[in-house]
């Protein structure tokens, strides 16, 4: 199959779903590229959109089109298990960091946040070794990893592996300050640039 990918939000931040789809299709012998609306010829095109404020792609492709992502207000479509748990194709964006979720969901029910509606309560997603590949740095997209025993176990594993990480959604400052074990654990982590804390409130 000839597969085209469209990152509707642009290429400023790697789209994790597209990297996983690319890895899966390449593993099955398919050709994969970012879709070219003028010269490309495809059997299927995947369009992924994270942000609702991003205008939709208006390009015309005369093939099967799959649109998904929170940007389409699609909170039910998920990747098949065999795609969800594959090591992403980091060559798609030419990045030198791994990207992924250790956990999904959140224990909080902040009324302004889409995470509880989309992902539910916190649960394990993937161990770090599942998506790190050959990279020595990882950008982790968890929403509240410190609220998960599995998440804390994976941070311990990250320390043992000696890789540098960035929890780019921020770590819950309240949980860290209330638990000396968490503070000690975070002190042992190698950070890509700096540690990010978050303390979301309505104010």
Which residues fall in each region the model found?
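N-terminal [4Fe-4S]-dependent radical SAM core
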Residues: 1-2, 54-55, 66-103, 107-137
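Generic, ordered loop/turn and secondary-structure boundary motif
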Residues: 17, 107, 146-147
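A short, structured N-terminal alpha-helical element that caps or precedes a catalytic domain
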Residues: 1-67, 72-74
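Short, aromatic/basic amphipathic alpha-helical patches
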Residues: 18-22, 56-62, 77-79, 153-158, ...
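Core AdoMet radical
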Residues: 5, 10, 46-50, 114-203
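Short glycine/proline-enriched coil/turn segments at helix->beta-strand junctions
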Residues: 27-30, 37-43, 59-66, 95-97, ...
């Amino acid at each position: 199959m000839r597969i085209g990918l469209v990152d509707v939000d642009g290429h400023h931040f790697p789209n994790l779903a597209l990297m996983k789809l690319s890895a899966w299709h390449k593993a099955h012998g398919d050709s994969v590229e970012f879709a070219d609306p003028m010269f490309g010829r495809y059997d299927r095109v995947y369009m992924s959109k994270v942000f609702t404020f991003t205008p939709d792609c208006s390009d015309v492709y005369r093939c099967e089109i799959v649109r998904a992502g929170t940007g389409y207000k699609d909170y039910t479509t998920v990747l098949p298990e065999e795609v969800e748990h594959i090591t992403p194709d980091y060559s798609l964006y030419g990045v030198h960091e791994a990207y992924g979720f250790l956990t999904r969901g959140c224990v909080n029910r902040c009324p302004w946040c889409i995470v509880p509606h989309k992902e539910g309560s916190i649960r394990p997603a993937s161990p770090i070794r599942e998506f790190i590949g050959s990279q020595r740095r990882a950008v982790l997209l968890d929403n509240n990893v410190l609220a998960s025993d599995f998440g804390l176990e994976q941070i311990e594993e990250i320390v043992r592996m000696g890789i540098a990480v960035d929890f780019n959604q921020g770590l819950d400052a309240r949980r860290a300050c209330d638990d000396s074990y968490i503070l000690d654990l975070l002190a042992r982590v190698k950070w890509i640039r700096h540690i990010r804390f978050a303390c979301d409130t309505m104010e």
